[in-house]
Amino acid sequence: MKRRNFIKTAGISAAAALVTPGLEPGTSDSYSGNSKDQISPASVKVKDNIVYIETFSLSAVIDKGIVISLKDKASGEEFIEKPDTTNFRALQLLYRNNELSNINEEKFGNTEVHQISERRAEIVFHSWDGDGVLTITADDQTGDLMIEPSASTSRPGVLACRWNITGLRQSLELVAPFFQGIKLKLNDPLIKNIRWGWPFQWEAGLAMFQSEKGGFWVHTQDNKYRFKAIQTGTQDDPFTIGFDSEAYGPIDDNLSAGGLCWRINTYRGDWKVPAERYRQWYWQAYNLDAEEKLRQKWINDISFAISWCPGDPAILDALSKKISPKKVLIHFPNWRTDNYDENYPTFIPSESAKTFIKKGQQMGFHIMPHFNSIDMDPSNPVYSYVRDFPYRSVENKQLQGWSWYNRRVIGVPESNTNRLNNQDKKVMVKIHPGLSIWRSILGQNMLKPVNELSLDLVFIDVTLCIWNIHNCLVESMPPTEGMNKLIKHVSELGPGLVVGGEGLNEITAQRQSFAQVHLFRSSQDSIEGIERSGGCNLNQVLFGRLVKTFGYSNLSGRNKDTETRMQLHLEHGAVPTVTISLADEIANPNASVKRMLELANG
């Protein structure tokens, strides 16, 4: 078994440039959007209970919370074509199992519209099952239309407040940070009726709707780790997009949700225009100029990667004859005396691994032994310190982690006894990264092999696994903030470490230097239509100045499917990556592996 089939949560059309990516170079600090020279101030006006918004870049009309018109001011392009003000629900409360409760006028409700100031209005909803407020503001500086939805009810169990945009023009393409970047028609089956949680699936808080010469985009400027989600379509209507503001778990007694502001604006050109504006905000919000300066210069030399590399020294010899070792990143999973994914967080190197790592270091290779960030074996003695702080589902409270039996995931035992006595089934429980004692134990246990093996880089698994959970706040931190702190803690062990991790999003990118990334809903086996998921390197644009990505699994080049997977990673901006079992696959490469080596060599 090379890797568990754990990440199956939420598809090559355009050829990637035949250039090995480096850390993304800096781009202009000026936003190349619409000019606001000699324009009127932004305004929000209420007339006959309809809200009219004007900024230097857009004009919009909102009726009962529904955007019935959204136009780019420079071109006059309209992005809403069939808004439904009769049956559609703009504001909703979300409960467990995707149950929605409408906040609107049906069942004897009413809607009020209030002019608050020259640039602000409120739409207040009083419905049978709850009340809500939609605050509408025009930002004079950015030209953004700002929407802040909130809703409350007497019924406990609220997970999120959803605000929907309906009637999107059918020719638009969605560009969004799902699996490193997608650019798909709104009615593409790959994204039909899916809720993408941030940041595990929705890897940054923005979405762009691209037309032939421009588009509009929606984003939130949130640096407080608040959970959110985007809903792409409904079962019956692919041209609806929902934006969720989540409440932290536990939600059993929760009666309300909201607090996030969604910013809407138009742009001319392609999606990289708003993506760059978001990157600039992101850099400032998290002080990433300082993080960028911490990156080691040798990272830019990396142009080739091997994922799940066996520990055969002959592989190093074969590689050295094909490419300079200083250009090669090696992800090394089976280096401990324990079996893979057993007995974490114990990290004791085997004698054969010591030989492999030492030889590789002497030759100049960059070898990343595989550790784990939050998964631990409950049969390990450390469990007694942290057993009260596991991940539990925000909806059903089940323990989260994994067990593996007969080549399939079977979940975590809820029996306290069975949880402790099934190491052979690779039982692992996720521990909240906000827990200081966990970070301390993990760091201490990692530092021993770091010193013994003279490591300067490590790989920590499942860093992408950060989402809203039942016990969401530990030491006042959600898992997102806790993971950020954990990655930084690992990077500061000993003399300092370069950190690689699994997946890439706007939280983990801040201190990771390498990211092993998944293809679209295809961590192991490729889904039907995966070839349509390429051609968009959005996350490379957002995070490429901080992180280099490399491929995940099934990258042998032995058949058409693995060739496609290798190409898709290139299109997302990853360095050429292969997965092999034997040294001969490097010494006598097939056509696809040979191509990856040629690309890596420039």
Label every model-predicted segment.
Residues 5-26:
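N-terminal export signals
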Residues 299-310, 336-350, 423-440, 468-479:
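The substrate-binding groove and active-site-proximal loops of carbohydrate-active enzymes
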Residues 373-448, 536:
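Active-site-adjacent "subsite" loops/lids of carbohydrate-active enzymes
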Residues 325-404, 489-499:
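Acidic/aromatic-lined carbohydrate-recognition and catalytic surfaces
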Residues 51-329, 334-335, 350-353, 359, ...:
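Carbohydrate-recognition beta-sandwich/jelly-roll modules
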Residues 331-333, 442-472:
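Active-site groove signature of glycoside hydrolases
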Residues 243, 253-259, 264, 436, ...:
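Active-site-proximal substrate-binding groove within the catalytic cores of carbohydrate-active enzymes
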Residues 21-50:
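C-terminal segment of N-terminal export signals and the immediately downstream linker at the start
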